[in-house]
Curated annotation (Swiss-Prot):
UniProt cross-references to SMART domains, sorted A to Z: PDZ
Organism placement in taxonomy: Eukaryota, Metazoa, Chordata, Craniata, Vertebrata
UniProt name for this protein: Protein Shroom3
All residue ranges annotated as the ASD1 domain in the record: 928-1030
Gene, per the UniProt record: SHROOM3
Ranges of biased composition (kind: Polar residues): 814-823, 862-871, 887-896, 1366-1375, 1459-1472, 1634-1649
Amino acid sequence: MMRTTEDFHKPSATLNSNTATKGRYIYLEAFLEGGAPWGFTLKGGLEHGEPLIISKVEEGGKADTLSSKLQAGDEVVHINEVTLSSSRKEAVSLVKGSYKTLRLVVRRDVCTDPGHADTGASNFVSPEHLTSGPQHRKAAWSGGVKLRLKHRRSEPAGRPHSWHTTKSGEKQPDASMMQISQGMIGPPWHQSYHSSSSTSDLSNYDHAYLRRSPDQCSSQGSMESLEPSGAYPPCHLSPAKSTGSIDQLSHFHNKRDSAYSSFSTSSSILEYPHPGISGRERSGSMDNTSARGGLLEGMRQADIRYVKTVYDTRRGVSAEYEVNSSALLLQGREARASANGQGYDKWSNIPRGKGVPPPSWSQQCPSSLETATDNLPPKVGAPLPPARSDSYAAFRHRERPSSWSSLDQKRLCRPQANSLGSLKSPFIEEQLHTVLEKSPENSPPVKPKHNYTQKAQPGQPLLPTSIYPVPSLEPHFAQVPQPSVSSNGMLYPALAKESGYIAPQGACNKMATIDENGNQNGSGRPGFAFCQPLEHDLLSPVEKKPEATAKYVPSKVHFCSVPENEEDASLKRHLTPPQGNSPHSNERKSTHSNKPSSHPHSLKCPQAQAWQAGEDKRSSRLSEPWEGDFQEDHNANLWRRLEREGLGQSLSGNFGKTKSAFSSLQNIPESLRRHSSLELGRGTQEGYPGGRPTCAVNTKAEDPGRKAAPDLGSHLDRQVSYPRPEGRTGASASFNSTDPSPEEPPAPSHPHTSSLGRRGPGPGSASALQGFQYGKPHCSVLEKVSKFEQREQGSQRPSVGGSGFGHNYRPHRTVSTSSTSGNDFEETKAHIRFSESAEPLGNGEQHFKNGELKLEEASRQPCGQQLSGGASDSGRGPQRPDARLLRSQSTFQLSSEPEREPEWRDRPGSPESPLLDAPFSRAYRNSIKDAQSRVLGATSFRRRDLELGAPVASRSWRPRPSSAHVGLRSPEASASASPHTPRERHSVTPAEGDLARPVPPAARRGARRRLTPEQKKRSYSEPEKMNEVGIVEEAEPAPLGPQRNGMRFPESSVADRRRLFERDGKACSTLSLSGPELKQFQQSALADYIQRKTGKRPTSAAGCSLQEPGPLRERAQSAYLQPGPAALEGSGLASASSLSSLREPSLQPRREATLLPATVAETQQAPRDRSSSFAGGRRLGERRRGDLLSGANGGTRGTQRGDETPREPSSWGARAGKSMSAEDLLERSDVLAGPVHVRSRSSPATADKRQDVLLGQDSGFGLVKDPCYLAGPGSRSLSCSERGQEEMLPLFHHLTPRWGGSGCKAIGDSSVPSECPGTLDHQRQASRTPCPRPPLAGTQGLVTDTRAAPLTPIGTPLPSAIPSGYCSQDGQTGRQPLPPYTPAMMHRSNGHTLTQPPGPRGCEGDGPEHGVEEGTRKRVSLPQWPPPSRAKWAHAAREDSLPEESSAPDFANLKHYQKQQSLPSLCSTSDPDTPLGAPSTPGRISLRISESVLRDSPPPHEDYEDEVFVRDPHPKATSSPTFEPLPPPPPPPPSQETPVYSMDDFPPPPPHTVCEAQLDSEDPEGPRPSFNKLSKVTIARERHMPGAAHVVGSQTLASRLQTSIKGSEAESTPPSFMSVHAQLAGSLGGQPAPIQTQSLSHDPVSGTQGLEKKVSPDPQKSSEDIRTEALAKEIVHQDKSLADILDPDSRLKTTMDLMEGLFPRDVNLLKENSVKRKAIQRTVSSSGCEGKRNEDKEAVSMLVNCPAYYSVSAPKAELLNKIKEMPAEVNEEEEQADVNEKKAELIGSLTHKLETLQEAKGSLLTDIKLNNALGEEVEALISELCKPNEFDKYRMFIGDLDKVVNLLLSLSGRLARVENVLSGLGEDASNEERSSLYEKRKILAGQHEDARELKENLDRRERVVLGILANYLSEEQLQDYQHFVKMKSTLLIEQRKLDDKIKLGQEQVKCLLESLPSDFIPKAGALALPPNLTSEPIPAGGCTFSGIFPTLTSPL
């Protein structure tokens, strides 16, 4: 370039013509100020195989106003002092990352076009020029560039994550391409010091530069926001932040994103830079790492000011300049030049190193390393940035805090500190793996990433730098390593893993760095690179040893001296990084210098340093608040990394343990692993030290502690659990002992075997093995396990092969990484979790040991684990490709691992490394593509798809039930089992924690990142708080405490975790079923179940009852439900076997899905509810975990659980969405198929339902089940505001506890244990019993006890009260009381529930057994307590609760009333009605928002369940009789859809009354008069505290209704209210009519009619209604042609039937709506005569009820039924004349009803206008408060809401029509017609299912939007928004219903008119016809209804 580095560094105000004209090129520097737009356009780039040139300069733009204008054709060489790799993406990201200023250096071909002539060549010439100008720069750039190029080459492999990268990856073989692709970012750093830096140079490395680099990176500030990526450099976090989860995944491989990487990396580097290389190197090398790190890095780079660590060849010093990317650009350019010249030489090696990280890392074989060394001497100087590592410690602490820390630390670090820091312990304990996995894959990892350092990516190199260069590793390790480990070290391994190519890039850089000073590479990309290098070292003892020892060691040394050095290096790395960090550049440089010569330790030191760097980072991380925790993570991760990369030693000596642990690590997806490495990996990389750093970190006496055997042991133990004692002391000692070269030589001697051999053979390895318990035996076990896993997981675990390959190259870390890429990370996470769980349990050592075996077994089972087996790694080298593919499968894994593998692969042949890299890139890219497609497939939240390891998980899941693997995901469980088995078993016992571990990997594997604003805010990638909720640690329940405490992980990678859980759980859950298969399976099972139980196959049943299968099933399987269940199951149901037994084949997947979601929910919820319900929940979760451990582990409990679970799976599984509760189980014990109910609603419905159910019905149960009651009910209550986010959380939470709590997990709750024996057993019995609910009730009791006990003493009594009858009987009551006990519930209930419910519950206290009996009895005769309880709950929730309570007991038919209440509540809970099962399901989804309150009422849900499944016996028996006798008692709040059930049980109070009462009930303080506002508030509140509000609504409503219905019914039931009530009745009565029909003796019509009459006219029908019914019956009896239309049969489907599950009719919403309407119509109603009013009510109710969609025909249907029974007394003539008269009379009556309906429609339109006005207000408010992108999300959501609702209505109407026609087809219908109809139905059904999925997606978006708005809006405003949204869909549906009813009425009138003789003149005179019919001539003759009816019915 024309300017020296310094010059370049200097800001230039103008386009400098200071052009270095070299040859035909002149370099111009343009300094643009003012911010974007900059006024020029870039085109070409590596991605397109063209030079990156300025295609056009906009006139008048900033670029056009320069003195020396930029010209089209100018090739952009540097941006912000970052040497470009010619990647357009990188350039774009750099430009975008520029804040106020943009510094460009362009090369202009003076000979040809000024701009582009030989841009490509020029690029490389440029570096020379640039280099030549500033020689040091040249060297640095050359080296860096070369490295970068090399890395770039490799990078494509890693980069493939991004599609662009993939493209470039294909071109990667070209060194220059590589250079461009990879050199782009990372290389600059690497090259920076690579060519210019020397070991000694590093000594000159200016820490200040490193330190200040973060600050210096002005870009960093902006990128800092992106930094979260920085936080997750290894993970594709940056991309998550910057681009997307896929990009993030790609970011590893996106060198085109290199700019992002550069930013990210730069930022990272700047932050992590200490380990850095030269400033430039740092930015470059780090960048490379970062680049590998992915967009994350790129983002960071943008955010970061690049510290150009320029190694001044002349000065022999590496100076760190804040290049603002310019240095990087220069470096890149030089790198390019170098790449052409020396760069290529180095690249030949380095490319291999990069392309073939192994060679690169291994020093790319001796030659590569040596060449790297030779070429990289300057670069070695760059490694001085290890000094940076020294400064890294400070830097990491300081710098990171400055840049990464300042922003990321605050944003990521702190969140991570909180997330990772706090999470760290928990994370390490339980969530570390999760976080790691997530962090790499998810933005959430951003925080975790950040925790382990996004910046650490650049820092990762820093880590290696710290790792390898830090001679005074031990001294500084305590401080620096931690940061290195934490951010960089971990990151590095993650990076290395993350990108085989990254590693290559890092390897290249690091290789170059490390090659020169093994450490430097570590610095550049030490952690990651060094990991690989270590393996490479292992692979190439010769080159590796010499260079590893000298330079390569640092990064490779980690592996290099895997056995001895690794251990020692590990320790040293732990310690050395501090050295590196402390010494900073000098020390590091000296270390680098020394390393080659002075450190035998050098080799081991570099390795140790790498380890130490990791540990150092960890240490420093420890130093940082968050670091302490994180260090543990890192230790675990580093340990993993060590195991992976450095585990050679670990694997060798400690490898038995380490390997076990590592194996688990391996099992963790490579990506995860990388991330793990980043997060855990830092610790893991530190390997044992890192893993131990958990201890070491915790000890923070890192140097001594970490260095000390204990530290390592700790880390190892942490990682491996069992090695904890030995690993800690022994392993640590091993590391130290083994660190010596003795092992290293062996390792080097056998690269693959050596790596393993090293791991195994080295003393360190031996020690490690000893420490691990399994030295070589472990390896053999690993091998065996690997074989097992291979066999088991087959191709799924190719990752194992890949791991094996990785293991060979990066056998320890990489292989493990690769192998465990999916599993390893999971395992690592699991390990960490186990460690966390075990450690927290205090059995870390033992656990680890046990876990190791188990992990070995399990891990080994997964290929990843096999990979862990060092020996098997070598043997599996060939499998690597598979592993790579497998790894690829795991997107994250693929990203990291494959790259790594190629590196390792290349390692064998240093020169071929690039080639390998290219193929690897392709293979990797293919893998990535596969993974991406999977991820995309998983976008449906189907973890199954996502779970690359998930399938294994599924497989493993099965074994898991039998083994302790349950806790862990199959990959993790199996793979992780071996290393983590102890933990796993440990976890298994506390299944939750265990599962949580597996789950997190799944989530990560899922690679689907959902980011919520909060998540982004918190740095965890998913927008769904659900992710947070599903914070995905099943373990979270138990480790919830830690995890929630260390929620960093969950928070940071909540989405990932959720995904992990979902995916893993889902995989486990589904076992071998694919998502779709499982979905279908579940749907079918649910449908079958419903069909069996109800006699009718719900159309939506699959989607409705089995909504889980439908929208939900996907959802369930998606993170929310499926994964949760799996996780929950594994975790919640500690005993895998019992879990397995518990699970029914069909239900099992669903249930797992349910469980996992619960787990996920819990985990995810943790962050969400962390402040309130989380704290309690977390503790509870922990307790619960303990309980689970004690209880779940307990054979009885386990067995019981097993017994119970099978049923529970049925009822529960089906009910996952419903959040089955003990009550549910009890209620539905007879219909155990209940599981079909599991997810009646789609994700939203399920989430809501679950939430509500958990809160309400299952609330008690959920409480028990939910590790955190708070999470359950509390979360639920919180969920109203956080509903969207929390909703799922609670659901998951609840599901988790609920799952476990179902019969086991709930018991597993801390409080459950005590009550567990009796209650649980009872529960289980109940569960097994045909009455699943009572058991659930018992569980609820337990739950209450568990949740409440931990939370409140009352909880215990409550549980006892609630457990059986209460809960089961009044799912709502039980649940409601329980939820109150949960913090959220309590808050929701205002504590009243807590206090009040106990009484009722106390009564019910005998409940567990009573619950079973009661639950059973409940069907027969619901005990009074539930209603009172419910009332009490309502009381608790509301002040009205007492009246409610008193009134509830007042009900004579309390049972019925309760049932009614329960049913209605249930209905609400389960959406309008589960009986509506199928139709209800979809409604349920929508209802879930509004319905959540409804659902909250457990009774309704429970009743509903009863109704659906037990409904036939119960409703018919109680319903029918109750219906009529009970008509007087008002049903529970109509809003809860009580009407339907009320009708079933007894006639519901007038809709108005009911609604009014409900409103009042719902609004404790809201008086009836304020219905409009109240309804709105109620709805909001409903959402807020679905259980309480709803319960209140139900009970209070019921009580009030009872008391006031009679008095106020007449006067207060206006048509609109009626209409609402009627609607409820309709949804419950009409839509559930079929159910009613089945349930009630009366067919739906009569039931509906009765409901209508009872509802509208109060218990008494208006005379007109009665007359209409009688007329209809008589007419139908006499004129069968009109039977269909006049007697709407339940068999006829209506639009509402099909809409039922999707948009659960929120009675509250309707209530609100009706309230408004009521207010409007009240005058009309009251003004009207009583008869008229009754008529109106009837009409409205009919309208609302639309019994069979025909509101008008509701009474008629009843009449028709009666008519059928009426004897034909009159002779035909008389009959005919009489019939005609009756028809005329009926026409008049129908006409009147139509008028009423028209009035109702008018009021509805008014409501719609009002709601739209409200929506406009809300929108205006939101537009002012929210960010534009958030506002866009809101607008898009609202717009899509309309579209989706209308689409569903349209499709539902068409489908209903077709189905009605089909059902009406006679036997004479032609096959052609029938087949045509079937085809239409099939098509429509498919479209409807798609629309339902859209609805699910919409529900997810709704939660996201709600989460966003919750941050801006006040509670009242939020309630307005929620009310608006709920009412929007509700009003649309109601409008359609009214239209359908009106249409039906008109059709009925029309048919009646047509059936009348043309000459007929009614005696009463002319017929009063509806306006639209008056003009129509009345055709003579009868109209065949059959022909018309289907048509009529269909719209209805």
